[in-house]
Amino acid sequence: MLRSVLLSAVLSLVGAQPFPCPKTCKCVVRDAVQCSGGSVAHIAELGLPTNLTHILLFRMDRGVLQSHSFSGMTVLQRLMLSDSHISAIDPGTFNDLVKLKTLRLTRNKISHLPRAILDKMVLLEQLFLDHNALRDLDQNLFQKLLNLRDLCLNQNQLSFLPANLFSSLGKLKVLDLSRNNLTHLPQGLLGAQIKLEKLLLYSNRLMSLDSGLLANLGALTELRLERNHLRSIAPGAFDSLGNLSTLTLSGNLLESLPPALFLHVSWLTRLTLFENPLEELPEVLFGEMAGLRELWLNGTHLRTLPAAAFRNLSGLQTLGLTRNPLLSALPPGMFHGLTELRVLAVHTNALEELPEDALRGLGRLRQVSLRHNRLRALPRTLFRNLSSLVTVQLEHNQLKTLPGDVFAALPQLTRVLLGHNPWLCDCGLWPFLQWLRHHLELLGRDEPPQCNGPESRASLTFWELLQGDQWCPSSRGLPPDPPTENALKAPDPTQRPNSSQSWAWVQLVARGESPDNRFYWNLYILLLIAQATIAGFIVFAMIKIGQLFRTLIREELLFEAMGKSSN
């Protein structure tokens, strides 16, 4: 018994001794080797021991992988042969690799695989064939790989897949078919993948997603279909994907979507639909998706949207409706229910106006971008009760004026971008400028807003305007410039008229009428006549009083003279 134990110990020590490492290799770990350079066709000449468990070969010269390259390596578990310009593989090359669990043949020039090349590797769990030149695959190529979990076939030239190609891969969890030339996926192709969690099909040429294709993928959590040629998606195509968390459909040719398409994917946390020529959305498209945090609908042909389009997306934090050149109107209440929304991007569209309640209920909103639209005015209460709002972008619109209190109730506001608008710097804008005078730090200095009119102030920035003299005083006179179309809008009835203006005069001007001044001229003439009459009366009275005084003085002198003569 003791002799057996000692013999085993000696044998293990002998096995632990490092083998002679080839010159072009590194052998820093026992049972593992890393080699570069040399020729693919002469791997056997490296003299690698047969008891290795890990082999990494890379950057080798172009050639054919020989059938005896790995002879006798029955304990090998990881074989990585990448970036080596392998042009072909001889049949039987991997026949001795019965314990192999990972085979990586990434970034080579392989265009064809022999039918039974993988049959002996029944324990294989990971197979990487990406970044090669594969054009087709034999339908029985993966038949013996019952334990395969990860299969990467991306970045090849595959245009067709046999219907039963993956029929034996019941344990598969990751399947990457991205960046190929696939135009169609046959029915039944994914019928056995009940444990599949990640399916990557992006950057192909798929034209449709047929009904039933994904029916057995109940464990799927990630499905990527972006950058294909999809023109249609079958109704209910995603109904069985109850665990799906990521779905990307951006960069396709979708002009419409079936009603209720996303009704049953309630666990989605990421959904992309941008860069599709969508012309409309169905009234009901989304189900309850409390976990969806981000949604982008930019680059479409949408003209408007259903009022309740986003009503079920209560957990949404970022919503992007940008670069839609035909989007000219938003329905009232469109964003109602998005109580968690932080970022709202509605820029680079064709919006000319916004509903008064467009942002109502978005108490957590921090950033709103409305730049690059055609907005001519903003509702006075648009930003009311948005106590968390930090940034407002309004540059590149057609705004001429803003209500004086449009940003008044935003305690967290730190940035307002107003550049590239045709601002009309008359008295109609003065209330807003008065507010802005106390909040100049909000304006961006890179592209400051400039006056487009009137002519006397054209090209002046708001900074320059506010640093000059008070050109629209509130205590005297009428505006120094003739009233313009913008200034002739009727004042808000809830506001009291400015003390420097007659309310009747403001109403006449608001109606475009010239005030009748004849009454004032008549009154002025009457006042002059009255003044002249009073002045004449005073002069006449003064003359009479002077004559009276002279008479009294004369009589007094006569009385004194008579008294003296009697004595």
Swiss-Prot record:
Glycosylation sites: N51, N181, N243, N298, N312, N385, N498
Ranges facing Extracellular side: 17-522
Cellular component annotations (GO), alphabetically ordered: cell surface; glycoprotein Ib-IX-V complex
Location of the LRRNT domain: 17-50
Taxonomic superkingdom: Eukaryota
Region named Disordered: 474-499
Main location: membrane
GO biological process, one term: megakaryocyte development
Record GO terms (molecular function): collagen binding
Pfam family, one: LRR_8
Bilayer-spanning residue ranges: 523-543
Keywords linked to the UniProt accession: Blood coagulation, Cell adhesion, Glycoprotein, Hemostasis, Leucine-rich repeat, Membrane, Repeat, Signal, Transmembrane, Transmembrane helix
LRR repeats: 75-96, 99-120, 123-144, 147-168, 171-193, 195-216, 219-240, 243-264, 267-288, 291-312, 315-337, 340-361, 364-385, 388-409
Compartments (UniProt record): Membrane
Domain LRRCT: 421-474
Membrane disposition: Single-pass type I membrane protein
InterPro entries: Cys-rich_flank_reg_C, Leu-rich_rpt, Leu-rich_rpt_typical-subtyp, LRR_dom_sf, LRR_TM_domain-containing
Stretch forming the signal peptide: 1-16
Stored SUPFAM superfamilies: L domain-like
All ranges on the Cytoplasmic side of the membrane: 544-567
Function: The GPIb-V-IX complex functions as the vWF receptor and mediates vWF-dependent platelet adhesion to blood vessels. The adhesion of platelets to injured vascular surfaces in the arterial circulation is a critical initiating event in hemostasis.
The name this protein goes by in its record: Platelet glycoprotein V
Species annotation: Rattus norvegicus (Rat)
Gene: Gp5
